[in-house]
Amino acid sequence: MKGFVRECTEFSLCGLACLLCPMQVGGYCPGCGGGAGNQSCAIARCSLEQGGTEFCSECAAYPCARYDEFDAADSFVPHSRRAADLARAREIGLDAWLAQLRQKRTILDELLADWNDDRRKSLYCAAAYLLELEALRRVMDALAAQSDLAAGPAKEKAQAAAALLQAEAERAGISLKLNKRKG
């Protein structure tokens, strides 16, 4: 979006973890406020109108109707954690939060490189986004323990990874499916 530039492109203005988005993973988007490839965004426009806050949570009007309406459906990533993730970044500090996101991205990259049958990118991105870091580590440890799978067919490896991720999601009481816009 013209004139909208941010220093932190890995974690968006509104609380989306750009670093875990399939569009950024695929190289199609530079992240929130990252320049060329950035999509037009009503929340970015609002930030510019409000003086260019780095995060919505810094705005005096937060949370506003524009912010809340954005959660009606997911885009390429789940929107359900935006407010909680903004609060977490504020609580532990942006650098610590970004370090956690980068660790999740490392796991996501490993899943995509070694445990993918070219049909799991959305699932893996949603899992990296929604599951806690420790849950993702448990999945990777369980996959590493299945040495017979390591050299197996991609489809079997992907099925094993997907099953472990789904089990962790069920344990946490969350769904790894994106919420589509109704109507």
Predicted regions and their residues:
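Residue-identity detector for glutamine
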Residues: 24, 39, 50, 100-103, ...
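Long non-globular sequence segments
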Residues: 161-168, 172, 183
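Short loop/turn segments that flank or connect secondary-structure elements
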Residues: 57-159, 176-183
